[in-house]
Amino acid sequence: MFDDKGKYLILGLGKSGQGAVIGLSNFEDCQVAVTDRKNLDDIRDAAAILEEHNVPYLNERESVERLSEFDILVKSPGIPMDNNIITKAKELGMPVIDELELGYQILNYRLTKPEERLIAVTGTNGKTTTTNLIGEFFEASGYSIYVAGNVGLPLSQIACEVTDTDFIVLEVSSFQLEFIKGFRPKVSMILNITPDHLDWHGDLDSYIRAKMNIFKNQTSKDFSVVNVDDETTFGLNRESKGRKLNFSKNSLRTEGSFIEDDHLVINYLDTKTSIIHKHDILLPGEHNLENVLAATTATLPFSISEENIRNTLKAFSGVDHRLELVRELNGVKFINDSKGTNVEASLKAINSFDSMILIAGGKDKGADFSEFAEAIKEKGVKKVYLFGETYKKIASALDKVYYPEYYIVNNLETAVTGAYQDAISGDVVLLSPACASWDMYDSFEKRGNHFKSIVYSLGGE
């Protein structure tokens, strides 16, 4: 329950923490302070927001000493539970919630039944594409919809803008879902699950349990959606009280979306309808077919016409940093897949192209790169440029499959220029790191934008 006169300490001044500051600033009786391990001088954007909203900043020592002055600790995603401030809060019996939960509590405080217009998407891969495509479906049908969460603005930031006539589709992560209390979407979906963020969750079972929280508060009035082709997600919605919807690249007898005779077909309310031939879907890549099916399934409980779904699928080409064509230079295509932050995502990227030079590496999240190395060899990737924290692990995996054509470089600039020098007309230079960006960049977006700026700086026609 949201307390509009509460005393909130926000832990973390990244995108989510800043969103929480902006959201809580709409309630004049709320008392808000912020803490972060970083010096405020090093996070100027955040400092400007604090100044604008007259929110004090506490260093780590001050926040621990003054913690008892607050009612609720709002943590940013990804901050581990062994953080000193979280540990102290638990000792004091203080509620610890995530920014996502704060946003939902504000929605519930302001609106009538906000859950009826809320869709949430999680999974290891495909979240951003699926979330954006759902937004496109609703916009094509004339609805007002916010695309938010990990893509767009944090829920807590938009929670005071949303009206009772707006829809919201959220991309949500395992970090956020681990700490929900009342969060309840009308439609909740898990796209797929492969090992990721094991450095944070500890093991795969913990990661899966966090993802499953997306169904935690659903009732019989809600809908739970899973990918029945994914052996890990299949059946995860059994414990959900929501109505079960499925999607598959194979024919289904249950309600949901699937492929039959090369057509996307929906089956809902005892009506089976063919929507579009899969070759007429603009979004490239076999893996994106799953994202299309998931997004289509999310529309079934709402009044989205088949024509609007069809027209959107003919026009939607994808999102930035996910198999994004940056430029074709002297016959060489440069593809930005900086969103490929884990092995499974990059495997799908590799399988989308032929005749490629790959750029990979980044923050070590505890991944096993053996399957990645095998795919590189089997696909016949011409060369691989490795950089970042994981270069040794990936190189070792490549050595074990007797793949010698890799080069270790210090930075992305060297990788891009080297790959371009090696490439010939018809080749693809693919940035798909299979790793997070945090060893060298603040986000995968900044890494992808740096890649694009390097590509645009290359000569040629």
Swiss-Prot record:
ATP binds at G123, T124, N125, G126, K127, T128, T129. Keywords: ATP-binding, Cell cycle, Cell division, Cell shape, Cell wall biogenesis/degradation, Cytoplasm, Ligase, Nucleotide-binding, Peptidoglycan synthesis. It is found in: Cytoplasm. The keyword Ligase applies. GO terms for molecular function: ATP binding; UDP-N-acetylmuramoylalanine-D-glutamate ligase activity. The keyword Transferase does not apply. GO terms for cellular component: cytoplasm. Cell wall formation. Catalyzes the addition of glutamate to the nucleotide precursor UDP-N-acetylmuramoyl-L-alanine (UMA). Belongs to the MurCDEF family. This is UDP-N-acetylmuramoylalanine--D-glutamate ligase. It comes from Natranaerobius thermophilus (strain ATCC BAA-1301 / DSM 18059 / JW/NM-WN-LF).
